[in-house]
Amino acid sequence: MDGGHGAADGEGVTDHARAVIVGGGVIGASVAYHLARLGWSDVQLLERRSLTCGTTWHAAGLVGRLRGSRTASRLVQYSAELYARLPEETGQATGWRRSGSLVVARTPERLIQLRRSVALGRAVGIDAHVIGAADVSRHWPLCRTDDLVGAMVIPDDGRVIPADVTQALAAGARAGGVRIRENVAVTAARVRDGAVTGVHTTEGAIACDVVVNCAGMWARALAQANGVTVPLWPVEHFYAVTRPIAGVTPDLSVLRDLDGCVYVREEVGGLLFGGFEPAAKPWMVEPIPEDFAFSLLKEDVEQFEVLMRGALERIPALESAEIQLLLNGPESFTPDGNFVLGEAPGLHGYFVAAGFNSGGIAGAGGAGRALAEWIVNGAATMDLTAYDPRRFLPRHAEPGFLAARMREAPGLHYATAWPNRESETGRGLLRSPLHERLAARGACFGSKMGWERVDWLAPRGVEPRTAYAFGRQNWFAHAAAEHRAARERAALFDQTSFGKLLLEGPDAGALLGRLAANDVAVSVGRTVYTPFLNERGGYESDLTVSRVGAESWFLVTGSAQRLRDADWIRRHITGGIRVALTDVTEAWATLGLMGPRARDVLARVSRAALDHDAFPFGAVRDIDVAGVGVRAIRLSYVGELGWELYVPSPRAGEVWDALVAGGDVTPAGYYALDSLRIEKGYRAWGRELTPDDTPLEAGLGFTVKLDKPEFVGRAALLAQRVRGVRRRLLLFALDDPEAVAWGDETIYRDGRVVGTLTSAGHGHTLGRPVAMGYVSCPPGAPPETLVRERYDIDVAGVRIAAAASLRAWHDPAGARMRA
């Protein structure tokens, strides 16, 4: 069927294209340019009004290279390089100016954040350094400095004229054969059998294989027409421009005072200043008017006051300056502050590039190239999981949730980047059936994929609220007690947020054999831990596969991978494959009973045979627990004897109560789970395992069976095995027991940068900080030689010596969990 959007295929079609891009802002122009560069000339870009008319035209044009992650920084690095060369290539100016950036710190905590950013910059090749407060005036003579503790300088940052960048990209796209049509609106994609076949427009239907939704503020509504989730919402966004001010020169760098919520740059001899208020103002309009083009919103002096105050505190000369413009232009933001980039789940050929959180100019070049490569190659060529549309549930796009979250999300761009920071708005989308019980026990909850999850539990008399810090946070001792309970006695984790899928049918085994790198052709009652790989040999997911029937498999994956894994499987159900895939996540609660006494605790409330011979490691059994039918899998993510108990959600409370009734079980949260798994060297999706990492690099070659029939990624791994890996995951233990690392710290080997930490925590069993991270190595070098080198970890500007290992620090032989 055609998805309910008009005529059948071929009927009413007035044009054809290989790809149609919807939206003529800087993002759409970048995608068009890069598709043309990759040889796709049969492309149309459709703009409902005129190029740049949505939000691009009023953007401030800042291009700051150093972002919050390695991937984001690399994307913007490319943008800066592109904008610098486009004028020569296309003959169209971009306004690129290498102005540099100066980021000032009012507090010691902010200075720690800047030092962490400098370390990240070194790892990705961005020049950045910290200066003292006394040196700030040399970079910015008009800047007040008496309340500063330091600053960060990024010499290669820059600025552009957004409309000019868009026109340059459009010129390059046209030169490559792209057809750009203005005053043509797209109303929906044409769909047949789960794939794009064209688009409906105000000028008729166009047949195409690919549609790219770059519709900016309108992207959510356009996506909804085809059942696609794009959770973004427009927010009123402000900046002011002054008339010329004495002492303001064109060579001033862009000044950012994150503690004051503002940025400042030169503008025709005056200053342009704006920022991100801690309490933003969503533009509460639905739908967004179709005729909103080159338009602005009403001035709101009261909302702008916090930015005005921050600017005055930093630039006293503004007190006597004349404001000639106060601009209020909407910008679209997403719930987690990352843009939406990639192919939509469940609809082949429907791509999205939207929700750039006021960073569209900086991100457009890199994002446009990354998405174009995805479209042309059929898969992403780099790790884009932080931006993948599959990270959101449909409920994340509901107006009530978005309106609440958008009051908070924009301000987090300039808020202190605390480790483990949790959003406070739009919470409670999904709750475990054990939520109230855990809340009564003092649980402090975090959020993952919409689920409320226990981070840590506060003892009686302690407020269950995290006090953020770059050092040890207030939960450290409480999570340590939970950690020790799992190592010494028994701990009980609520892991209900795990994604749970049921795959059934005559061809289920063959399909899994094609997708899984491990051998999943096991007998009924066995569980296998396996990667799902892409064609590059990188991780698409890691999960457990339990055979629960002759034609039935129970798949358990991480909380964030629920939609991702289901979509990955469905994409491979082709050619009459006889299977049924069902998401049963919310039907089952998950209890993780872990620790050396776990068998005794479970035996007290179950009649099942639990000894090692009857219930070995890796087995799955349907047993009774307190009279409730439970699916038990003997696995451990903490490195101790344990079971994952899958309980029908309505009866989860009965099982929980029975397990804790004896008083010998300690409820525990995810902070303890994380320190336990790092101490044991267990890799985590999104940290050690990403689409850019292979099992051979991750030290998980034992989870891959290269001698089994063909599976996705096998050829890439065979080739890598021959040529040798160029990077390898190592486990680290820091020498300083008081050091606090959080991940993303830079790794030095013999004084040279060789990688960054992927995970870090405190090994309470070892009494030392522990971490993991990839380091570069010569191809074919024996891994054992890597651990004999000298390593240091840059923790907020201080290098701390660390021991390296290929094996787990705790129970490297794995005997305890197999007891």
State what each model feature region is.
Residues 60-65, 101-103, 217, 226-250, ...:
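Central beta-strand plus flanking loop segment that forms part of the substrate or channel wall
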Residues 30, 70, 188-299, 306-318, ...:
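Flavin-dependent oxidoreductases
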Residues 382, 389-819:
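Glycine/proline-enriched, intrinsically flexible loops and inter-domain linkers
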Residues 12-27, 44:
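Beta1/beta-strand and adjacent pyrophosphate-binding region of the FAD-binding site
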